[in-house]
């Protein structure tokens, strides 16, 4: 199976299913929304060559983008070719929200300490 619905993902979470959740929304889209699906790790989709080898094949991976189209499906296919049990979230973040599932706010950006002369 190469996809998972928001309802199925919510059930996996409720049942404590072991999986990795990857947020691959473009940085500008992610920033506009201001929230993630709790537990997701964000990876810049444009830099996938830099992070693809860090994704473990030891457990399933759920990939979500903004709408569950090109970015999420494309990266899911790439990960599957690399031997990862990956599936994209149908409808992406938009589908997750449309079904009323909870999200978590982005952590506040860290600011460097002020320098005093």
Report the location of each language-model feature.
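Rhodanese-like catalytic fold shared by cysteine-dependent sulfurtransferases
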Residues: 1-20, 24-62, 67-117
